[in-house]
Amino acid sequence: MKKRLLTLVLMLLSLAGCAGQGNEDIPKTGAYTFEDDLGRTISVDKPERVAALTGSFADIWCLAGGEETLVAAAGDSWTSFDLSLSEHVVNLGAIKTPDMELLLAAAPDLVLVSSNTAAQLALLEPLEQAGLTVACFNVTNFSEYLRMLEICTGLTGDGEAY
């Protein structure tokens, strides 16, 4: 609950601090290109099916306007972040041991992975070998949070959410 409250406070602060600085010029269609926190260039069309391997990333994705496209999320999305996700969102289990079979069955076209979690980084190669686009983020402070939110709003095409 505290994490959810912190996320809400951070979001409110970002809205107040970024008034008039939204991503209004974000294209609604076509490929969106960005650099993830491993320094890799990622280029992806607007995702229609997204998996988030941490609850905080599921929260950011939903705040960025992607709630309808979230198809799989870590278990803490419901327990720690109390997100009201669709009944169709697959619970992947624990952050450090996401269920790969369920993840692959959800058929995401984008997977949001924490570069802070060794177990998730270990999934990077197998996920990419399975043909999935994987973006790694390291969100430990407010500026990193805003950076991920900006990228996610770019991906969803919802500049107003930033």
Per-segment meaning from a language model:
Residues 29, 37, 45-48, 65, ...:
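Extracytoplasmic
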Residues 10-17:
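Hydrophobic core
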Residues 6, 62-65, 124-125:
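Short amphipathic alpha-helical segments
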Residues 52-106, 110-117:
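A short, structured surface patch at a secondary-structure boundary
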